[in-house]
Each structure stands twice: as C-alpha cells, then as structure tokens.
C-alpha cells in the first residue's frame, strides 16, 4: 500500500539539502554497516511533493515518491552495464533512526555514495518539443546545434542531441546552454564524458521504452564524480519527472502528445490567474488522481510493477 509523505522527519540524520521533490540527509558513520564506514554516504528520500513551473505546490501526489524511486531503481539496474550509478545496496531500514514509522521511507529512499555534482543538467533530446521547440522556432538551433529546416513540433530528430542546461536553485529557472559553455563551466574532458554517457544511456532507454509502447522524447540526467574522478549517474533516472514519455499510439507530428507526467497539473495551472511564483495554488482532487494514475501507468508499462 502506498504511503504519503510531504516532508521527511528523520531525527539524528542531518538534513543536507531539501530540493523540489527530494530530501537529502547525511548518514552518520555509526549508523552504517561496519564494512562501509570508510566512505561517505547519503540517504535520498523521494517525497510526494509536486513542482510545476519551478514552484513546489502545496498538495502532494500520494505515492508519487515511491513510484519515482522504483522507476529510478529499475533504470539504474538496467543501465549499470552502460554507466555506474550512485546506489550502494545498503538496506535503507538499517540507517533510519529508531522510533519512526520506517514503512514511510523504505520504498521511497535509497542509500547512495556521496559524489561531487558536475554542475550542469545533462539533457538528451530525441524529439523536438518543449523549450527545444521554442529555441528551434526562434533560431533554427537547439543549444547551439543547427537542425534541418522545416521540422515540426514533436518531430523525431535525425539523431538524438545533447542539450545541457544550468542547474538552478529551487524557485529559479534552469537555462539552456551550448556545449562550448559547458566546456567552460566543467572542462572539456568532463564535458565530453558527460555528453557521451548521456547519449549512450538515452539510445538504450529509448529502444527499451519503444518496446513497451512508449516514446522517450527527452530526458535529464545528473552526474557526479568520486574522489578518484570516476563518473556516476546520480539523483533520479528516467522518471516521469525527469523525462518526457509519450504513448506511441497517441503520437502525432505537429502537436504536443499526451505524456506520462504532471501535464494534467500544468494544463490546469495555465487556466488560473497565477503568476507562477510561490506560493502555488491548491489542486482539485480530480487533477491529483489523474496525475497519480499517469505515474502509476508509467511504472507498470516500463518496469512491469503494479502497485494498486
């Protein structure tokens, strides 16, 4: 049975970062298994918070964090032959403080390596949609990459492209950047490794998703390095929050297809007299239920996991 969690409450675990959806805690070494105490580890909790237009909304989507965690874990396991990831395999319950309801966390949290984020969002696009479509209409390019003339909205690109962005703080907007800017920010060697890993994973995931009847239009990864400079994929992976998934049977060039994400929420918010700054408006129950159903369907179709 799915639980609902809006804010993590874990006495004894120092809160390192509170993001739009995830709460990140340092794990004191005394709480770790003896054979892992030589490293540094984090507990990452996927809450049921929902953000839209970079604003965290007041209403949670029940079970969303569990669904996101399970989808991420599925993809981390499925792509580990392509790229190492931040997971450790340490049992979540073993690091949680005593005296809390651990069932709130065991299906929505993971113990991870503590890595140094590379400082950019790594985005792969296989289709022309969203901010990429807007850039193309204005300049004929996406993140500095020249594309053929005459492409339509939602059209498949000749080849997937790497279109990084800055990583903004909560409440601020990410900005698309070109590869040269990425090189200036993180260095040429690391930029090339991140680009190559992003496209490698995208190719693999898009092929698998298509076999499930789903198009992976675009997706966003985060990467980090360890003290030896080894690159890992981290945070979340190929979830409906970080990816644009479309049902193949509803895909049509020239229009924005329905997606397995919070589009119901965005569409509803666009009907309101709201300036897209905090605090966000409350959501009707129907919008919450329909959004949750989309996340649940994505988990079932991609990972074969039924949670209801």
Swiss-Prot record:
One of its GO terms (biological process) is 'de novo' IMP biosynthetic process. Pathway: Purine metabolism; IMP biosynthesis via de novo pathway; 5-amino-1-(5-phospho-D-ribosyl)imidazole-4-carboxamide from 5-amino-1-(5-phospho-D-ribosyl)imidazole-4-carboxylate: step 1/2. Disulfide bonds: none annotated. Transmembrane segments: none annotated. The keyword Zinc-finger does not apply. Its EC number is 6.3.2.6. Keywords: ATP-binding, Ligase, Nucleotide-binding, Purine biosynthesis. GO terms for molecular function: ATP binding; phosphoribosylaminoimidazolesuccinocarboxamide synthase activity. It catalyses: 5-amino-1-(5-phospho-D-ribosyl)imidazole-4-carboxylate + L-aspartate + ATP = (2S)-2-[5-amino-1-(5-phospho-beta-D-ribosyl)imidazole-4-carboxamido]succinate + ADP + phosphate + 2 H(+). InterPro entries: SAICAR_synt/ADE2_N (IPR028923), SAICAR_synth (IPR001636), SAICAR_synthetase_CS (IPR018236). One of its GO terms (cellular component) is cytoplasm. It comes from the Bacteria. PROSITE patterns: SAICAR_SYNTHETASE_1, SAICAR_SYNTHETASE_2. HAMAP family: SAICAR_synth. Belongs to the SAICAR synthetase family. This is Phosphoribosylaminoimidazole-succinocarboxamide synthase. The gene is purC.
